[in-house]
């Protein structure tokens, strides 16, 4: 069916007209005049931290997800607890979030270059893009202009989707943040550079159900390997666990290939193969890395726009409100 140029432009303007004001407020060139070196400063900080600690990319990407999923992308995950309030970073799902120092370091440098200009929320969003790119993944232009939140509550971290969710629960959780089924499967691909402690998946390895000792959706040999990494002994190291795909330092589509082989570490990951709503997406990305990269960049922009505040502050210190 052919469309005239006039009709196409009309359709584009119609779409732009329904964009939420909070999303429209963001701009890829937001700091071009006020802090032109902002992205360079953040990139150099992230790159140096990654050279020192290869775990930084996975940690900062996870930080971005956990920040955006609570009150939107507002850097509330960075705030410290006080005597009267337990903050997000001390909520159970966030106890294992690490590498806050990287964001703090970037923010200190930005305050010297451009005082009270670049928000902590934008630093997290840009850093998340940078760690993906530095790990071999896609690049995208980060929309900027977020404001930093002043509220951070540990009890709200219960809204983060746990690794035990089934597909219906995952779909509902992501939909509450304006994300589609495809966005959910795509963003789950961030686990390609992830690591998990045993506590997040060991329920799949033993006494799984009344009828199965091991989760039947898991590759048996893979389950035995994980059992060795997570022995049920009193002297098991507190950091015992496993990477979430076999090329954990590289951002690629191996995560999806492993799901096809029954080697998804989390129950929520492997469940994506058992549901017709998500199976085709897993299969597509396992076969086409370029498609995964393209969709991941788009979904990250979409997640980064969630809950953006039109009013707020540009925090001077990442850990405290002004």
Swiss-Prot record:
Keyword Heme attached: yes
GO terms classed as biological process: hydrogen peroxide catabolic process; response to oxidative stress
EC number: 1.11.1.7
Disulfide bonds: 35-114, 68-73, 198-230
InterPro entries: Haem_peroxidase, Haem_peroxidase_sf, Peroxidase_pln, Peroxidases_heam-ligand_BS, Secretory_peroxidase
Catalytic reaction list: 2 a phenolic donor + H2O2 = 2 a phenolic radical donor + 2 H2O
Residues annotated for Ca(2+) 1 binding in this entry: 67, 72, 74, 76
Keyword Calcium: yes
Positions of substrate binding: 161
Binding site for Ca(2+) 2: 192, 245, 247, 252
Annotated site, Transition state stabilizer, chain positions: 62
Keywords, alphabetical: Calcium, Disulfide bond, Glycoprotein, Heme, Hydrogen peroxide, Iron, Metal-binding, Oxidoreductase, Peroxidase, Secreted, Signal
PROSITE patterns found in the cross-reference section: PEROXIDASE_1 (PS00435), PEROXIDASE_4 (PS50873)
Compartment(s): Secreted
Molecular function per GO: heme binding; lactoperoxidase activity; metal ion binding; peroxidase activity
A GO CC term attached to the entry: extracellular region
Catalytic residues of the enzyme: 66 (proton acceptor)
Cofactor: binding details: Binds 1 heme b (iron(II)-protoporphyrin IX) group per subunit. Binds 2 calcium ions per subunit.
Binding residue positions for heme b: 191
Signal peptide annotation: 1-24
Domain of life: Eukaryota
Family the UniProt entry places it in: Belongs to the peroxidase family. Classical plant (class III) peroxidase subfamily.
Protein's job: Removal of H(2)O(2), oxidation of toxic reductants, biosynthesis and degradation of lignin, suberization, auxin catabolism, response to environmental stresses such as wounding, pathogen attack and oxidative stress. These functions might be dependent on each isozyme/isoform in each plant tissue.
Note: There are 73 peroxidase genes in A.thaliana.
Protein name: Peroxidase 66
Source organism (scientific name): Arabidopsis thaliana
